[in-house]
Amino acid sequence: MDQRGEDTTLAPHSRMSGDQTAQDPGSSLGELDQQNVVNRVVALPLVKATCTAVSSAYNSAKDRHPLLGSACRLAEHCVCSVTTCALDHAQPLLEHLQPQLATVNDLACRGLDKLEEKLPFLQQPSDMVVTSAKDTVAKSVTGMVDLAQRGRRWSGELRRSMSQAMDMVLGKSEKLVDRFLPMTEAELAVLAAEAEGPEVGTVEEQRQQQGYFVRLGSLSARLRHLAYEHSLGKLRQSKHRTQEMLAQLQETLELIQHMQRGASPSPTFHPPKTQELWGSWSPCLENGRSHSEVELETLALSRSLTLELQNAVDALAGCVRGLPPSAQAKVAEVQRSVDALQATFADAHCLGDVAPTALAEGRGSVARAHACVDEFLDLVLRAMPLPWLVGPFAPILVEQSEPLINLATCVDEVVGDPDPRWAHMDWPAQKRAWEAESADPGGQEAEPPRGQGKHTMMPELDF
């Protein structure tokens, strides 16, 4: 019995030992749960306060709504049952993976330590975090509003500065235009008529009352008009100078022709230099001047007039860049006439060296040049102002030469191979046969194609 008693006394002890041994993994797992990273996360003030707020809201919702509370309690009971069953079945697996779980827990705790260092607000309650976030957002919005206000003030100052600068530039430009391109008589008359009206300010006051774009548009239009008038005046001066040179040269050529014929001078009016030669030709012996001296002076006068005319025509050619080709052709014709005259007197040492035919051709060239100058100015006056404003007012128009057309190819395309049906006919018979074949069956001939419109600088003005 004693032995059985010992066995009975030892059996419970052994069973207790086995139970304690079976409970040891559970105790170690409890210690692991105490050091679990999840517990640390839940213990954070921010998370704890948030969970408390959510729990209180959940409980109050269950109390206010009985049906919702019953459903929630049923769900809680189901979740607890499922969790208990899952833990009972997962206990062997957790015991088997205890070393790995400990390693993962250690790494997670280290990461949580670093996260707490970088995010101090995790140690603060949720209401404090929300308050600080509101303050931060309010400060950011206030800063953005201040920045927008400063930007608006800066843009206003920039706009005023730009307006003042543009007013200054426009004022200087208007003064320069008034100084270098003064108003014409027609514009002065218009201003005088406007000044007679009631309550009309000065030109400066009217300009100050106008807007920037209005002033800029009026300045550009006025500058274009004044530039047109200025350029037209220069062309008129060049035209008058060229015509004066041509008139003097014509009188000189007439003098040379009379001197070659031995005729007496006519008492008509002549230019000053030519008048002197006309006066010295008849009484040359009385004044002690020989016939050869007068001839040399006449040739010298002809060369000087030709040189001056060449310079005037060169200046006129420099002013016609950008003009229509017809106007440039007139100036080129004048240049050719002057070059021919210069070649006529280049090698002459006396009046006998100038051939009468060359002299007659020279007079004809001078007459043609005089007519070309008149036609040139008429072409300029009929042309639009803008196309021929060159230099600082508009870019120079450069005409591109078109490639030459192969006439043989065009003839082959138009004529084509002869029709073998009409090979035995002469040309008039072939023409009549072709007209009869190409005629309309109704008895009306086909309308010939219209010619291509003439190319102009401004097609919209062609009617």
Curated annotation (Swiss-Prot):
It is found in: Lipid droplet; Cytoplasm; Mitochondrion. Residues 1-188 are annotated as: Essential for lipid droplet targeting. GO terms for cellular component: cytoplasm; cytosol; lipid droplet; mitochondrion. Keywords: Cytoplasm, Lipid droplet, Lipid metabolism, Mitochondrion, Phosphoprotein. It comes from the Eukaryota. Residues 1-32, 433-463 are annotated as: Disordered. Its main location: other. GO terms for molecular function: identical protein binding; lipase binding. Highly expressed in oxidative tissues, including heart, liver, brown adipose tissue (BAT) and slow-twitch fibers of skeletal muscle. Lower expression in epididymal white adipose tissue and anterior tibialis and quadriceps. Expressed in adrenal glands. Isoform 2 has the highest expression in heart. Residues 1-123 are annotated as: Interaction with LIPE. Residues 444-463 are annotated as: Necessary for mitochondria recruitment at the lipid droplet surface. Residues 200-463 are annotated as: Interaction with PNPLA2 and ABHD5. Belongs to the perilipin family. Homooligomer. Interacts with PNPLA2; prevents interaction of PNPLA2 with ABHD5. Interacts with ABHD5; targets ABHD5 to lipid droplets and promotes interaction of ABHD5 with PNPLA2. Interacts with LIPE. This is Perilipin-5. It comes from Mus musculus (Mouse). The gene is Plin5.
